[in-house]
């Protein structure tokens, strides 16, 4: 319940400096009297930030970053990178990074790219699944098209001609 009002007081432990990276670039340490000061959990929420000789976080609690992502859904920033085809999932996928006021909550989650950019996901599907054939499916059209392409490649080899099979670009436009 407190997390909803203290989203800007979430911190991620930096193992090198033994400090927490907080919202908007703030760096703080847990108050030495805190029971969590020696345990050093990865993610904490503090009730107050007090600046004396350095910035201290007091009244701390260990949190799960998924809680902050869910509670702060209206303020988290999501960035997506490296869209690619996953033959295992038979879908276009991308890597997602989720931050809350600059604090990384999720570093490298693989998500479906169709929700993010449907047109680009369709292009990835067409290129990788239908044209390159990297798709395990029971659809008859796909099996028939692959068989036709194999027959045309065989015919090209027999006749020593390279103009029977259309290019990948033409196949892309066809689909």
Where are these regions (language model features)?
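Extended, charged helical/alpha-beta scaffold domains that provide interaction surfaces
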Residues: 1-175
């Amino acid at each position: 319940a407190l997390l909803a009002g203290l989203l800007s007081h979430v911190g991620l432990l930096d193992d090198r400096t033994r400090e927490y990276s907080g919202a908007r670039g703030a760096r703080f340490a847990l108050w030495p009297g805190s029971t969590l000061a020696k345990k050093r959990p990865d993610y904490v929420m503090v009730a107050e930030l007090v600046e004396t000789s350095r910035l201290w976080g007091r009244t701390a609690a260990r949190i799960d970053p998924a809680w902050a992502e869910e509670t702060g859904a209206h303020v988290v920033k999501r960035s997506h990178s490296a869209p690619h085809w996953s033959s295992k999932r038979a879908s276009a996928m991308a890597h997602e990074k989720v931050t809350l006021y600059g604090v990384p909550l999720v570093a490298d989650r693989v998500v479906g790219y169709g929700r993010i950019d449907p047109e680009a996901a369709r292009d990835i599907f067409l290129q990788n699944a239908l044209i390159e054939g990297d798709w395990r499916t029971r659809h008859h059209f796909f099996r028939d098209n692959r068989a036709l392409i194999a027959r045309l490649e065989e015919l090209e080899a027999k006749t020593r001609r390279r103009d029977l099979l259309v290019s990948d670009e033409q196949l892309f436009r066809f689909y």
